[in-house]
């Protein structure tokens, strides 16, 4: 059973529960993604990195995070 202080989102196609009031920055920080090596999409819209601290997560949001890895 999910606690009342959590909301359900989809992260990269998988269901994830996050705290109510969480923002995109807190999610990325919790997942340990380096901001300079990711692209973020929320509900099919690209998110500017400078705005992620202001973007709240809401129930049923679809978040896609792409992590870039260098190689040769």
What are these model-derived regions, one by one?
Residues 1-71:
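Ubiquitin-like/PB1-type beta-grasp interaction modules and other compact soluble beta-rich domains
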């Amino acid at each position: 059973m999910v606690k009342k202080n959590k909301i359900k989102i989809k992260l990269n196609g998988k269901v994830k529960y996050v705290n109510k009031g969480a923002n995109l920055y807190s999610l990325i920080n919790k997942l340990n993604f380096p901001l300079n090596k990711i692209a973020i999409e929320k509900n099919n819209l690209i998110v500017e990195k400078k705005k992620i601290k202001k973007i709240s997560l809401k129930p049923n949001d679809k978040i896609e995070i792409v992590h870039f890895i260098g190689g040769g």
